[in-house]
Regions:
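Glycine-rich phosphate/pyrophosphate-binding loops
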Residues: 1-5
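Structured C-terminal cores of nucleic-acid metabolism proteins
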Residues: 8, 13, 18, 23-220
């Protein structure tokens, strides 16, 4: 029994959508073949976009196409890294899964008996849940500081790209500082918009309490 960091296969439809999206930037990935071949093609994509203006957007869309990595005693490999067996610990930061790995390595290297699988699977589940809570808190704190920062720039114009499309409006990520805000649907005209389209916006509203940024499109 051992805690692994596992990462399942991505949904085939999401892979196809990702490949369609990155084609507009001149990239492509494999959407069929062995999991190792597909994984390596995605890693090549992430290498190819480094230091390019589209890096942040392509990385974000790529992550949305992937399953979330988690901890488990039931090993299925790590798709993103193309490893059949993968676990880890960090230094000097110590997360609880790091401590489990340390303790079990010490136990097994000393010839100790295996541990209860059910107990460690429960600990892995708890660690995965806490990791997600921490990630959500990090995103919320980053968003708070973005809104605070842009709140001092009301009325200013910035160039960006459409990073998301929902029934409520368009999300735009700014090229200069990677802040993201929304252009509400009520403020949009009849034009056609798609992910990755370049746009120019004006900072319209910044609600720090709700951590919301509203942009207005500037027609050029």
């Amino acid at each position: 029994v051992f805690p692994y960091r596992i990462h399942d296969l991505p949904d085939p439809d999401k892979l196809e959508n990702l490949n369609w999206f990155i084609n507009r930037f001149g990239y492509k990935i494999r959407t069929s073949g062995s999991k190792t071949e597909i994984s390596k093609s995605i890693n090549r994509l992430l290498d190819d976009i480094k230091n390019k203006k589209e890096q942040n957007l392509v990385e974000t869309v790529s992550l949305r196409a992937m399953q979330k990595a988690r901890y488990s005693t039931h090993n299925i490999g790590h798709y993103g890294l193309a490893f059949d067996y993968y676990t880890h610990f960090t230094s000097p930061i110590r997360r609880f899964p790091d401590m489990m790995v340390h303790r079990l390595l010490t136990r097994y290297l000393a010839g100790g008996r295996t541990v209860q699988e059910a107990k460690y699977e429960e600990l892995c589940d708890h660690s995965s849940e806490m990791e997600q809570i921490a990630a959500n808190a990090e995103r919320a704190s980053v968003k708070y500081k973005q809104v605070e920062f842009m709140g001092e720039r009301l009325g200013m114009e910035f160039d960006g790209v459409i990073s998301g499309v929902t029934e409520w409006g368009l999300y735009v990520e700014l090229n200069e500082n990677k802040c993201e805000g929304m252009v509400p649907m009520r403020d949009l005209g009849d034009d056609y918009y798609d992910l990755g389209d370049p746009v120019t916006i004006k900072v319209a509203r910044a609600n720090l309490e709700k951590k919301q940024l509203d942009f207005a499109l500037i027609e050029k």
